[in-house]
Swiss-Prot record:
Gene3D superfamilies: 6.20.50.20, Immunoglobulin FC, subunit C (1.20.5.420). GO terms for cellular component: cytoplasm; ribonuclease P complex. One of its GO terms (molecular function) is zinc ion binding. This is Ribonuclease P protein component 4.
Amino acid sequence: MPKLARKQQKNLIQNIAVQRMQRLFELAKAEFPENPERSRRYVQLIRNISMRNRISIPRDIKSRICKHCYAFLVPGSNARYRLKNGYLVISCEQCGKEMRYPYKKLK
């Protein structure tokens, strides 16, 4: 198999994996109000796809998943969002861990 074909095949597999992660994220978002355990399972599947294909989880998905207990985070339901000292602090209500993301202040 030529090298170019192998690279194209790898890119195709990565694109399919990202599409599946996006779809599972949408399903987790829709399923959370009725069945939070199913949304947690969808998050586990997202992580499995990411690890199996050795690609990173997209940023918009990664910011909605707890880095400690891997719960699907919904503001006001099981997560608390606060702005403190130039950071967005997301607190998971299930495990109590905090994640901090810097944000740029307007001058």
